[in-house]
């Protein structure tokens, strides 16, 4: 029966005993007048290391007297016939004491062999019966366990078959009821039931289950084992039990394909744009919060607040065009104005103490004009008045500075520089620029008259007091900024395009920069940051180089610091320097 039988046999019957037990070791053979004690020795029981002895004692029984005699016999007197050993055993050792039996006959030996055989048979039969009883109990135990498992599996299979039959009946009935034939049959059966006043029996749908449970084998199986339950881990009270779950699943349309869920389009990029717009709003409001010491700071911060607002609207749609594309005519006029200023040294020397504070005043104007030009043109009209107010207040503060700074700037202006080396300039370029100037003046006589009326520079300003000079410089700054805007707008609207041969060359621009005009110095600082250009200016007709204003020297010294911030030159300062009489312009 395998290992399991041995294990169960050891458990039920105890430890197995060996055949060579102690009961077999000694046997008593009784005859009429003679008693002989023999021992049955196996090979494993023979002890080879017994002590040696020279004399062996033999026990003999006297038949007549019945007395036991002992004889000392040496090893040399013992023969092979006198040694008696058990059957089937042979040994070579002579240390075992021999037993002499001279008085036994052949008949007695046969009787003793028969008796020994019967005893062995009885003992072997007992052992065989004991093993059989153990195997019989093991077989019964196995049959009991296997029968229990088989019956339980059979009950579970029966319930499964009942569920499958019920599901098939439900599915087929549903399909038939939905078909055209089923609808007609249902109407006929319904009419018959209404006429006969009979109700439909719900158990008719489960005829197959009834037939299955009416089987004799199934009934016997369920009746014989009332405690046997099907193999499932659910209870009838649990909604997830077999029968209830089967009904719920069959009620659902399991034959229809499962509808695929619609893919939801992710709106992550839109959300990101909204988050960026919300995060940009508090940044703009933060720039608006800090307040400065004077009143004009509020106007300036409000104007700066509008700049990122406009750029945020137009970042992705369009980019602002560079001003260099639209200003070929304006650049030509700038060169002409600088020429007018170079030919008038008397006016520059008289206005020199006034321009030193104006240089510092015009620095903050650069930032405002930069934002005005880079932004859209609709903002020009709204931003003019606050900028003028800011400039006037800054001029008042700067006019109160000590005159020592003005003298220091004058000393710096009179220092010789490398500009004096370029006295001899090309006269052909001067004639070309003068001809261009005359052509532009003839085209726009009315516009120049309006600008001349607004310009009020006088060469004899030395006799006036310092207070009047400051007031005039303020008026000039406000007036020139307005006229400059009007001229720039007029040029864009009315002036025709100038041909390429009439435009100023790069060499003329470079020479203009070398003569130290404030226009060229400011323009170079801006163009170094953007596009490298060369400015040239023709020499005056009389061959004289005028002294430079302190504004020019300060621009040369601070050109590296403010070059990146200034994108365009100040139009107001250029017009103020170029305000001369027609007689001076003829030079």
Curated annotation (Swiss-Prot):
It is found in: Nucleus; Nucleus envelope; Cytoplasm, Cytoskeleton; Cell membrane. Gene3D superfamilies: 1.20.5.190. GO terms for cellular component: microtubule associated complex; mitochondrion; nuclear envelope; plasma membrane. CDD domains: IQCD. Residues 424-434, 495-506, 544-561 have a biased composition (Polar residues). Residues 357-373, 390-413, 435-472, 482-494 have a biased composition (Basic and acidic residues). The keyword Hydrolase does not apply. GO terms for molecular function: calmodulin binding. Residues 112-140, 141-163, 164-188 form the IQ domain. Its main location: nucleus. May be involved in cooperative interactions with calmodulins or calmodulin-like proteins. Recruits calmodulin proteins to microtubules, thus being a potential scaffold in cellular signaling and trafficking. May associate with nucleic acids and regulate gene expression at the transcriptional or post-transcriptional level. This is Protein IQ-DOMAIN 31. The lineage of its organism: Eukaryota, Viridiplantae, Streptophyta, Embryophyta, Tracheophyta.
